[in-house]
Amino acid sequence: MTSQIQDLLATDQDLLLMQEGTMMRKVRTKSWKKLRYFRLQNDGMTVWHGSQPESMPKPTFSISDVERIRKGQDSELLRYLVEEFPLEQGFTVVFHGRRPNLDLVANSVEEAQIWMRGLQLLVDLVASMDHQEQMDQMLNEWFQQADRNQDGRMSFREAQRLLLLMNVEMDEEYAFSLFQEADVTQSDDLGSEEFVQFYKALTKRTEIEEIFEDFSSDKQKLTLLEFVDFLRKEQKEKDHAPDLALELIDRYEPSENGRLLHVLSKDGFLKYLCSKDGNIFNSDCLPIYQDMTQPLSHYYINSSHNTYLVGDQLCGQSSVEGYIRALKRGCRCVEVDTWDGPDGEPVVYHGHTLTSRILFKDVLATLAQYAFQSSDYPLILSLENHCTWEQQRTMAHHLTEILGEQLLRNTLEGLLVDSMPSPEQLRGKILVKGKKLRTIEVDKEEEEEEEEEELEKDEGPDLDPASPELDTQPQPETQGQAAGNKKERKKKVMKCPMSCLLICGHVMAQAPSSIPESILLSKQFLLLSSTTIMCPDLSALVVYLRTVPFCSFTHSKENYHIYDISSFSESKAKNLIKEAGNEFVQHNARQLCRVYPSGLRTDSSNFNPQEHWNVGCQMVAMNMQTAGSAMDICDGLFRQNGGSGYVLKPEFLRDTQSSFNPERPISLYKAQILVVQVISGQQLPKVDKTKETTVVDPLVKVELYGVPEDTKEQETSHVENNGINPYWGETFYFRLQVPELAMLRFVVKDYSRKSRNNFIGQYTLPWTCMKQGYRHVSLLSRDGTSLNPASIFVYTCMQEDLDMDEP
């Protein structure tokens, strides 16, 4: 373990008490609440539990798996049990990724505080570790696991077991020779320092040594000029290579003398390539680096579908935890489906299903607390309102009272309504997206023009089941006729629009007597396109994001405003992409749109968001509770720009006159060739950690997502029985027509002859954020959490103007 952890374990009173152990109640559901004995292990990195202090304990969690510790008051489950347990005695362990939270109740407030402080201290310590400290900690954990008799020494038999734990199968004779080399005391066992040498021998990076020696004249060090040459030729650093070389030597060269002489040793070279500076993801793309002052329609927006669900779409649980997790992932558009609930309180759930229900006001309280913890750019609340008039008034009250100043209630001062505000202008604000009684008004003249448009749309044919398909195209009318008919139109009795004809009687029947007749007969009231009566109080809270039905791109261009937004099912959007890709691009350059998963995805699976991003769809809503390649692509895109949830679209997707069509792309430049060499892997985890004797046979699949012409994949052969340092050395070529839209995904799998290859890890990033040269790819789990130190070592470069056949 690191010296810092050792010192804390010996001196910190909270950690000392945690090492002694505590009986606490583990809470899974309202009815499942059982006493368990929890204890922090001596390594300071693992918490074990058992039914009793003397029982055989089992590992519960590693500190590296924990994101944060929450107090009991913030636990949805513990709040339900407040009559059984004081909230002050409870706390929640929140894990990275999609792993369920662990709710615990201590026997006293003091005990709860001890565990909360102690765990958070260790979590913060792990988060602050650099790469070398993380490696030291991992080596300590491996040593502790292999040292079965806990004597602080490792025999060869224990070392053989360790090799299996480390995911490598090695010839016994060769393994014994490495063991003997490390056993400098010739005691037939290894101490902790000798074990480190044994590990280094096991994981010797010969492929990196070869690269080093290619640029080193004496094969021992890189001079400043040699390192600059490497950075320019291989890492494509170009003009700033000399300054960068000095900076990297100062940062990674372990020898003080080497730093003074401006030279880089083999160890320093390895440290550089294994650091964040040697990562494939360009660190320049990690903070906010894009222009955030453009209209909202110019950005991809990280969006969630049915955010309240943490399971499937039919019987899954609804929970405010769904909102917390989505917001934690940088989501900037969450969905809220509201229905009438008991006691006059609206509830949120997936209507007409067996999903559980949560209170609307609890959702808002969660948003108020977590909306801007991961990103301070605007949060969009996509409201699917199914409530009656009275409960809509309650919704409006809760929105204004609970969200307070966070809620955007008026247009921005000085901003004309013919221009959408930017993410920068809306920082710290929550916007309601939903239906609205009337459009945003600028002046009296524009209001009258809008009334004329609505009157023309209202004058549809009488309802007749046998009527032929209605012609939605406007009929030609001379200027004289238009002027002459204007007054006549205003005299006519207003009719329901086509979408409301079937439900007029129902609407009037369910309207509360408290609604004035003037409102019931108003145009704004009758313009609703559903059976729900729209309450003016709720309508007034929809400022910039008015939901409107989609008829056609021509209709939208001629009748809708820049603040109008339409939603499309994934199948509808795909058809429009194929039939009118360029019109879709122009539509999305002008106004926002939202794409949501098919209703047939009852298992909460996801579709590929890339094909919708290709036409500039801003809000591609994902089932964030479901892991898989689609969520990997989504997470990969929004990993950049500070994790703000907003990514600026390419310029050709922001131009309302753009000629771009992803189905038939014509690149402004000659197609480029992406070269990817998959070289080696490091410390790949086991697929099944319960099977100590199994070792993975890894292969790497390189996937490219973009316009249809650019979407393809290639994979390496598999390496047998080696998860610790497999070597592939295979090169692939990908032709890129539109690299600005490309997403690159590396997937490591365990080869199986009898069944599907098993997932080990993955990493996905945009082409625009890819660093060229020799780079490490840090692998993530299926849940998107770090598998550190697992990685693959690759070489990438772009070859322009290369005339070659498709590989």
UniProtKB/Swiss-Prot annotation:
Q: What is its EC number?
A: 3.1.4.11
Which GO molecular function, any one, fits this protein according to its record? phospholipase C activity
Residue intervals of the PH domain: 16-124
Region annotated Disordered, chain positions: 442-490
What domain of life?
Answer: Eukaryota
Q: Which residues bind Ca(2+) 1?
A: 147, 149, 151, 153, 158
Keywords per UniProt = Calcium, Cytoplasm, Endoplasmic reticulum, Hydrolase, Lipid degradation, Lipid metabolism, Membrane, Metal-binding, Nucleus, Repeat, Transducer
Report the induction information.
By treatment with growth factors such as bradykinin, lysophosphatidic acid, and Ca(2+) ionophore in addition to serum.
Classification via Pfam families: C2, EF-hand_like, PH, PI-PLC-X, PI-PLC-Y
Positions that bind Ca(2+) 4? 697, 721
Q: What are the residue boundaries of the C2 domain, all occurrences included?
A: 654-781
Null mutant: what phenotype? Answer: Mice are either sterile or produce few small litters. In these mice, fewer eggs become activated and the Ca(2+) transients associated with fertilization are absent or delayed. Sperm are unable to initiate the acrosome reaction.
Which segments of the protein form a coiled coil according to its record?
Answer: none
Active site (UniProt): 305, 350
In which compartments does the protein localize?
Membrane; Nucleus; Cytoplasm; Endoplasmic reticulum
Cofactor stoichiometry and binding remark:
Binds 5 Ca(2+) ions per subunit. Two of the Ca(2+) ions are bound to the C2 domain.
Record comment regarding domains: The PDZ-binding motif mediates the interaction with GRIP1.
Q: What is this protein called?
A: 1-phosphatidylinositol 4,5-bisphosphate phosphodiesterase delta-4
Origin species, per record, is Mus musculus (Mouse)
The gene from which this protein is expressed is Plcd4
